């Protein structure tokens, strides 16, 4: 009788733990996706995409654009001075390599002139709420897909 009672108790505890493991695993998966980890976006096409990053400072606003066309990339920096209202820009071109969710950008031409130190970025492709993002691995800056941004603004 005791063995039967312990056996049933053990069996019930095992089933309870399995149910908790399933819900805990779902929660961890959602958290990983929110962080950008454990997403399988190999089939997402980023060709002909434009990503935007805007940073506001006290004296100026910085807008950065990453435009991807095939294996080439155009990286544009636009600086808007708040005091004078003037804008200046730098247009870099280069190449891009993508392995799964990681995107490596190397822009070594500034307005068709080779620069000694190219602009390099290592970016993680993520998707949250059906919006594509590129997250800078080093700085944690987030570029949003302009197409997704313009859809939500309409």
Model-derived features with residue positions:
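A short, structured loop/turn motif at beta-sheet edges
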Residues: 95-102, 127
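Lipid interaction determinants
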Residues: 20-91, 106-154
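Bacterial Sec-dependent N-terminal signal peptides
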Residues: 1-24
């Amino acid at each position: 009788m005791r063995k039967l009672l312990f056996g049933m108790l053990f069996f019930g505890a095992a089933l309870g733990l399995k149910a908790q493991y399933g819900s805990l695993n779902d929660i961890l998966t959602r958290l990983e996706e929110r962080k950008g980890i454990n997403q399988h976006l190999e089939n997402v096409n980023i060709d002909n995409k434009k990503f935007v990053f805007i940073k506001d400072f006290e004296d100026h606003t910085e807008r950065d654009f990453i435009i991807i066309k095939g294996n080439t990339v155009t990286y544009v920096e636009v600086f808007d001075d708040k005091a004078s209202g003037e804008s200046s820009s730098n247009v870099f071109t280069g190449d891009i390599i993508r392995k799964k969710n990681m995107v490596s950008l190397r822009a070594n031409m500034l307005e068709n002139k080779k620069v000694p130190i190219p602009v390099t970025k290592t970016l993680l492709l993520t998707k949250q709420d059906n919006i594509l993002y590129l997250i800078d691995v080093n700085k944690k800056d987030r570029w949003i897909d302009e197409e997704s941004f313009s859809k939500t603004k309409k």
